[in-house]
């Protein structure tokens, strides 16, 4: 039997900070707001204690990416902030330390109560896979900081254009070669390989 600690227990387009009794190292919060164009913006905030991490959509050799099982099927565009690389005991993973926010866009008919279960993997010396059931009352506002926080989260996403002056890739005899040039030079460059969706 799992015992859940809900902070706070309120119905709003803001879940408040949720913690699970079996994982005191992470807190999660979901907020959502439907826009005039019909799209719904959702922000998943994750706060991790020092020394703990969670994972990117392509977590690397270990770890599990966060996922949401929606109670109502939805079309979701989940956006991922630029990750960090973690090398521990010869295993390389990609993800996040500290606080991270994942901005998402939901399309389609949003029910008055948006609910589901977030599954989040967090790791330090041990790994914990935790489920966070949530329910958002979409008839109420997400709060006055939502637009600011969503815009700020969008600013943490990888740049699509303008970072390189030249980018080429070739695959010959089982070897992938990626060449990236930047006129301004590089400071601590990193390449993150993402699996195909």
What are these model-derived regions, one by one?
Residues 1-5:
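Sec-dependent signal peptide recognition
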Residues 7-9:
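N-terminal signal peptide c-region/cleavage motif recognized by signal peptidases
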Residues 11-197:
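Extracellular/lumen-exposed scaffold segments
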